[in-house]
């Protein structure tokens, strides 16, 4: 095949559809004044529209990450609000801690965004991730 013919081919990425769950954003950035800062908020467009976020300086422990969840104005959504399933706070807390540790231990990373992360009754799943160096 010539290069020209190969560049005309369409490529697709097909992935299994993830089940519904509560969507959050987990992120961190190396701030020039504060150092590694970790963010948690509602995911998708809600992160930008509502501004309901919690911030902490890394490193974080599990208790710090759990407190970030409680700090959200929307924290009731994690507890089975209006009959929705109760979310796995412990699994989300582990992701929050891990993202903080990655930014803390990797000076070349300026920013990490996991958005959305779906939180389920058992476990979490990052559906999209961006790392900026």
Enumerate the language-model features and the residues they cover:
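ATP-dependent carboxylate/acyl-activation modules
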Residues: 1-133
